[in-house]
Regions:
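Solvent-exposed, polar/charged alpha-helical surfaces in well-ordered, non-transmembrane soluble domains
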Residues: 16-19, 23, 27, 58, ...
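His/Asp/Glu-rich mid-to-C-terminal helical/loop segments that flank catalytic regions of hydrolases
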Residues: 40, 159-229
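Sec-exported extracytoplasmic/periplasmic mature domains
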Residues: 20-30, 62-66, 118-126, 144-147, ...
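Alpha-helical metal-binding/catalytic segments enriched in His/Glu/Asp
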Residues: 1-54, 210-213
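Generic, ordered loop/turn and secondary-structure boundary motif
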Residues: 9, 61, 83, 129, ...
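Solvent-exposed, acidic/flexible segments
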Residues: 8-15, 50-54, 106-110, 114, ...
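Short amphipathic alpha-helical segments at helix-loop
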Residues: 3-6, 102, 191, 195-198
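Metal-dependent peptidase/peptidase-like ectodomains
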Residues: 37, 47-184
Length: 229
């Protein structure tokens, strides 16, 4: 049975953040010459049934594969839970993709997307951490079809280690470093996942990192060559 709760961080945060980016790009396209620099089309999607087994994204991929349109999609970026209260600036690590279920062609691009997100956080002088490419979110069906994927994740029921807390303390200060040996989102799948559960600082920077990556990829002259060398 799916859990019952407000779902503000999981996954209202990623849903709203993606919508904010889509609206901002829409304004840029209408009011500026932004389109002149775009080399790829963007499609913003919100999937249903993730908690019940990635139902929405799986159905989309199945239908797109059946009608031949799946080949139009070069990359999938996934933003699921990006405002956890005891957050990590988590980046999906392409190197941890399951080699038994992931086509080889998806790996170089997925690793490059990982580096792209790292680039943002290092430019902003922010800490970051690798997150496992577990397939538990809606990028999974795309990755399984050989499409390069990447994304951001501030954490769910994982624990923040002492090393992580100390590193965040050095870079962010005591107010933003969180607690060691504590769950990243103690309200994960619980009724307390309300607006008060959202870490606004983490959320802001995760949305900015998402926007940075989308903008970069959309403007690449040869996106497919970059993803699939």
């Amino acid at each position: 049975m799916p859990y019952v709760g407000p779902g503000i961080n999981d996954n209202g945060s990623g849903t709203a953040g993606t919508l904010a980016i889509a609206l901002h790009i829409s304004r840029l396209l209408r009011q500026t010459n932004y389109a002149e620099n775009m080399r790829s089309r963007l499609k913003f999607c919100w999937w249903g049934g993730e908690e019940m087994g990635l139902l929405g994204s799986t159905d989309f991929v199945r239908r797109a594969k059946a009608d031949g349109s799946l080949k139009k999609y070069s990359v999938n970026l996934n933003f699921d839970m990006i405002g956890s209260p005891n957050f990590l600036f988590g980046i999906y690590d392409g190197k941890t993709a399951d080699n038994t279920t992931t086509p080889v062609r998806a790996l170089p691009g997925s690793n490059r997307i990982t580096r792209l997100f790292i680039e943002y956080f290092e430019k902003q002088r922010l800490p970051w951490d690798y997150m496992g490419f577990s397939g538990r979110s809606d990028y999974g069906p795309f990755l399984a079809e050989g499409i390069a994927c990447g994304g951001l994740f501030t954490g769910a029921d994982e624990m923040k280690t002492q090393e992580q807390r100390d590193r965040y303390l050095r870079m962010l200060g005591p107010a933003l470093s969180g607690m060691a040996r504590a769950i990243l989102d103690p309200c994960y799948h619980r009724s307390c996942d309300t607006m008060e559960n959202l870490n606004q600082f983490a959320y802001l920077h995760m949305v900015k990192a998402a926007a940075y990556s989308i903008d970069y990829l959309a403007k690449l002259q040869n996106l497919n060559q970059w993803l699939y060398p």
